């Protein structure tokens, strides 16, 4: 059987692509080396932030707004909501370049963002402490996503729509010819007109020339009471320390508040190098500088987890066809800020498989930027 689209890697982007391409009427085969959702990629840990006024650059905002529409639609397929509109407050020094980008994105796209000085910030959320020179940019319409629930939902919807799924089967080789793409797996060979490579952290095992660096990252859950929950209107947050370190976190659930550090981590080259949480001496204490200064009422570390970022050299996404192979799209280099975009990236992949030109300007995400 020849498929219209084979998806190599069915985590966040791959799961979304499988659903949207199948829904569009294509014959799709989704593959994954494991059984998604799983612990081997970048999507586990229950929750991910979603922010609209994007500190990483205005080029992301159109993608973000489309992604939000798709998240809202996906949430209707579950009794438990996938998107929780908790609001997100971005904390940092008044001269922060990241916050300046947030403000610029909000102004350009007329997004609902409220600026609070340090006093107003601590008055609204007495649990938060910041220096006098800090500000907060509060996005009331943003919040967080239930990442594993989202992937489970996409997989179910794709399967119900007739999508073929081959999991726990690693792709060992990809062959290109005039008729399309053939993949080799432990279960045999499969052929399609087009392919999406969304293999996340270990994409270089299949495409060694891609400029992607795997980074081991950790996040942890700390003891917190009801003051830090959505029931008390406590928001999700990002926070920049005076030394430039960037943290992110979520409202407490079941008296546990999840927090992680966005920068830093350990460069790795193979899956076995991603040691479990607490295997690196600094893991348990990584969030202490932020908690001690900004959220002093939070208690001790309860448990944590390790994941992996697939970092590109400039930490911007890679969305492009493989050089010399126009029938193969690669989406990688999401650099620790990609999950919130998963539905729109999946839709872009479905449009690619349909032969449609994307309605988004994807020029900033081309591979050619690294050779200029």
Swiss-Prot record:
Residues at which FAD binds: 4-34
PTM sites of type S-8alpha-FAD cysteine: 307
Record-linked Pfam families: DAO
Annotated cofactor note: Binds 1 FAD per subunit.
GO molecular function (one): sarcosine oxidase activity
Domain of life according to the entry: Bacteria
Cellular component aspect of the GO annotation: cytosol
Record keyword Transmembrane present: no
Record field: catalytic activity: N(alpha)-methyl-L-tryptophan + O2 + H2O = L-tryptophan + formaldehyde + H2O2
SUPFAM superfamilies per record: FAD-linked reductases, C-terminal domain, FAD/NAD(P)-binding domain
Keywords: FAD, Flavoprotein, Oxidoreductase
EC annotation from Swiss-Prot or TrEMBL: 1.5.3.-
Subunit details: Monomer.
NCBIfam families: PRK11259.1 (NF008425)
Family statement: Belongs to the MSOX/MTOX family. MTOX subfamily.
Function: Catalyzes the oxidative demethylation of N-methyl-L-tryptophan.
Name of the featured protein: N-methyl-L-tryptophan oxidase
Gene: solA
């Amino acid at each position: 059987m020849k498929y219209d689209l084979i998806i190599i890697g069915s985590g966040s982007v791959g799961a979304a692509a499988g659903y949207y391409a199948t829904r569009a009427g294509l014959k799709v085969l989704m593959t994954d080396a494991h059984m998604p959702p799983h612990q081997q990629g970048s999507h586990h840990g229950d929750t991910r932030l979603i922010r609209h006024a994007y500190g990483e650059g205005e080029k992301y905002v159109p993608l973000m707004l489309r992604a939000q529409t798709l998240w809202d639609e996906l949430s209707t397929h579950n009794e438990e909501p996938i998107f929780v509109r908790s609001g997100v407050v971005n904390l940092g020094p008044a001269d922060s370049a990241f916050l300046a980008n947030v403000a610029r994105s909000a102004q350009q796209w007329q997004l609902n963002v409220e600026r609070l000085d340090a006093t107003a910030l601590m008055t609204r959320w007495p649990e938060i402490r910041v220096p006098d020179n800090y500000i907060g940019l509060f996005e009331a319409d943003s919040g967080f996503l239930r990442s594993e629930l989202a992937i489970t939902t996409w997989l179910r919807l794709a399967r119900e729509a007739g999508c073929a799924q081959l999991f726990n089967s690693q792709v060992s080789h990809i062959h290109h010819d005039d008729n399309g793409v053939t993949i080799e797996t432990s279960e045999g060979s499969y052929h399609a007109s087009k392919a999406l490579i969304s293999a996340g952290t270990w994409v270089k095992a299949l495409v060694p020339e891609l400029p992607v660096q795997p980074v081991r990252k950790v996040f942890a859950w700390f003891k917190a009471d009801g003051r830090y929950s959505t029931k008390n209107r406590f928001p999700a947050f990002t926070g920049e320390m005076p030394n430039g370190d960037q943290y992110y976190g979520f409202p407490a659930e079941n008296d546990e508040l999840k927090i992680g550090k966005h920068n830093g981590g350990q460069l790795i080259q193979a899956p076995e190098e991603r040691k479990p949480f607490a295997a690196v001496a600094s893991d348990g204490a990584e969030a202490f500088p932020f908690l001690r200064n900004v959220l002093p009422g939070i208690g001790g570390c309860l448990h944590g987890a390790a994941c992996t970022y697939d970092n590109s050299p400039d930490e911007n996404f890679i969305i492009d066809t493989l050089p010399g192979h126009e029938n193969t799209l690669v989406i990688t280099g999401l650099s620790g800020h990609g999950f919130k975009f998963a539905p729109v990236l999946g839709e872009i992949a479905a449009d690619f498989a349909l032969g449609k030109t994307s309605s988004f300007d994807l020029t900033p995400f081309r591979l050619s930027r690294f050779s200029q």
